[in-house]
């Protein structure tokens, strides 16, 4: 019995390297190096197809049916109606999308039905529009995330575009839990400097860099330049991720007929995921949105030995080192049991 337990735990520990749900995202090995390893030493890296401008219940269901496993939602605080709305262009009194509550409840219901909803990326358009005690405050939207999304196991990414000095950013920064992360937009050196200067206490695995352009081919480059070009900046961000200075790196926005750029982003820049969809339109079912999703999904399928589409089993903000130490403590526990000792961890990882 003890021997079988020991073997089982050893196999579980090996999953930190071999199994998708436990695999470190990219801690030191590039795909071209991993290919040289025997299969039992390889790990596969999870990839995220992030649907762009999902602001309606219908958009959520369409994106899920297209294979999206993560979702970018534009969020506007409505100081007149005292709430948050999914809306790209913030204008009080005009609601382009559904309420945040309705959006969140739909995501939670879809996840409960077994659909893949790994994380929801909130892109705040006017994060400081309301003060603390209003229903449209940053505190209110964070609590709504925790009450609805996170209770169903859905992770949250708070996105701040040129809002690092906002009260909202500071509030989120000071109140992150392990199901949440922060994304900052910009070139690699800028993002790293911002995290180290304005959010030094935010764990590295909860630091996300995003970079791109509405017109992705504009200034894209070939991934080998010194700086500035989209692909190069993202590749340098992935280098920081491998060094443990960032948790994830995401690109935006791929659209129809941009499979070549998707190939560069995933294959050369080694990003963790790509926002895809329409350039300037909210998400809905269309041949172009389906094609943009398929560019990412088919790329991963063709390289399934090294990559896979992230599932609900993945925690994108996981601290892999903490997990490894927890498994190691259980391994030690089994050894102590074999010597008639009893010292096993009581808390979860």
UniProtKB/Swiss-Prot annotation:
Family: Belongs to the sphingomyelinase D/phospholipase D family.
Gene3D superfamilies in the cross-refs: Phosphatidylinositol (PI) phosphodiesterase
E.C. number: 3.1.4.41
Necessary cofactors: Mg(2+)
Signal peptide: 1-18
SUPFAM superfamilies noted in UniProt: PLC-like phosphodiesterases
InterPro entries assigned: PLC-like_Pdiesterase_TIM-brl
Note on how the cofactor is bound: Binds 1 Mg(2+) ion per subunit.
Record motif SMD-tail, residues: 310-317
Gene Ontology biological process terms, A to Z: lipid catabolic process
Keywords linked to the UniProt accession: Hydrolase, Lipid degradation, Lipid metabolism, Magnesium, Metal-binding, Secreted, Signal, Virulence
A single cellular component GO annotation: extracellular region
Enzyme class: hydrolase
Protein name as catalogued: Sphingomyelinase D
